Regions:
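Intrinsically disordered, low-complexity polyampholyte segments enriched for Lys and acidic residues
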Residues: 2, 22-25
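Bacterial N-terminal signal peptides
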Residues: 9-20
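Active-site-proximal, glycine-rich beta->alpha crossover segments in alpha/beta enzymes
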Residues: 122
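N-terminal secretory/targeting leader peptides
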Residues: 10, 25-118, 127-351
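Short, intrinsically disordered low-complexity segments
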Residues: 1-2, 16, 89, 255
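Bacterial N-terminal signal peptides that target proteins for export
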Residues: 1-11
Length: 351
């Protein structure tokens, strides 16, 4: 087996689901549209999802992965898949927030579930079924998680940002709900696809960007063109990446093969989360040694951001009702169920 596909534990997990690989004579050849052209790690996550699908289906399905922008807009992967331009896509559902804001509740947004809560909610508390029903009803695609990330690092910035005053007039690249929430802090927001983020920051078209994690951003090189690393990631407590499948292509598969695709997505989700979390633990010192300045936001900024995030979600729920109000209530009830977790999970930090 090629390194980086499936660990022994991952294969055991698939077998525990009652799934195995079964050779077939002819392969279905699929194309995968992705949102990623902003760094190799996210592209690797898409490729891992494709390889895991191939492995578990014993090559019943073969997938060619295309970089963001080569099979339609990188911010419109869902539409590319729905129309049948490609059979499958790998993206972040929050990019569809302009069509239906409920997407950010499943993708991760400021004030929402953190990574641990999201994992448990999706896989153990009915979140997955709700998410799939929503994506099919509103977007006409089959969807399942194909990657997950812990809290993002914050911002790479050409300007020092620590206080509420520092946010005033800050030109910030972002996406999803934060594009509407951050202006409450005084920032001016712009949405850019991954391929445009680095050159925009390099040329000073924008002052700061939020984009992923310490380890992922290290490979892109944002630290070379922006001196300041602003922490923590108040905008994104987690990010769940998804695979979307064209409905006609999905319906052509046997029930068993459909389950294998879902299993491949779950394996990819856990593996990617573990890889990024592990790499982040070692990436912090890299930035310090590279001469970057680490800036921790003042408590008043963090508190204000949380206040704005809750108010934003309440406003959208009141105005739009429907799916957004339904999912928001379910997630907030789940957050309350976790509100005492620190009492039985946390101890003093290591010295």
């Amino acid at each position: 087996m090629k390194r980086g596909l499936l660990s022994g534990g991952a294969i055991a997990a698939a077998l525990a689901l009652g799934l195995g690989a079964n050779a077939v004579d002819a392969a279905e050849r699929w194309s995968m549209a992705t949102a990623w052209a902003g760094g190799p790690i996210l592209e690797q996550a898409a490729k891992r999802a494709a390889r895991n699908i191939e492995f578990l289906t014993d090559n019943e399905i073969k997938i060619e992965v295309f970089p963001g922008g080569t099979m339609g807009s990188p911010l419109k992967v869902t539409e590319t898949v729905r129309k049948g331009v490609t059979e499958i896509g790998h993206s972040w559902s929050g990019y569809d927030w302009g069509i239906e804001k409920t997407t950010v509740l499943f993708a991760g947004y400021a004030g929402g579930l953190n990574a641990e809560q999201m994992f448990h909610w999706i896989y153990e508390a009915g979140g997955l079924e709700l998410y799939q029903q929503f994506r099919l009803e509103k977007f006409g695609v089959i969807a399942f998680p194909c990657g997950a990330l812990p809290r993002e690092m914050g911002m790479h910035s050409r300007k020092r940002v620590q206080t509420l005053e520092d946010f005033k007039g800050l030109k910030l690249r972002t996406a999803g709900a934060w594009a509407e929430i951050a202006p409450g802090l005084g920032a001016s927001t712009v949405i850019l696809p991954g391929a445009e983020v680095y050159p925009a920051l390099e040329r000073g078209v924008i002052d700061a960007i939020e984009w992923a994690h310490l380890s992922i951003n290290k490979t892109i090189g944002f630290h070379k063109i922006a001196k300041y690393l602003i922490m923590p990631g108040i905008h994104q407590p987690t990010a769940f990446i998804e695979c979307t499948v064209n409905k006609k292509a999905w319906d052509s598969l046997s029930e068993r093969t459909q389950k294998l695709l879902m299993a491949a997505g779950k394996l990819t989700t856990h593996k990617f989360y573990q890889e990024v979390g592990n790499a982040d633990a070692y990436a912090y010192d890299f930035y310090v040694n590279s001469g970057n300045e680490i800036v921790v936001l003042d408590d008043e900024v963090i508190e204000k951001a949380q206040e704005l995030s809750y108010a934003w979600a309440d406003k959208v729920a009141a105005e739009e009702g429907g799916w957004f109000a339904k999912v928001l209530k379910i997630q907030r009830d789940y957050q309350m169920a976790w509100s005492n977790a620190y009492k039985y999970r946390d101890t003093l930090p290591p010295k």
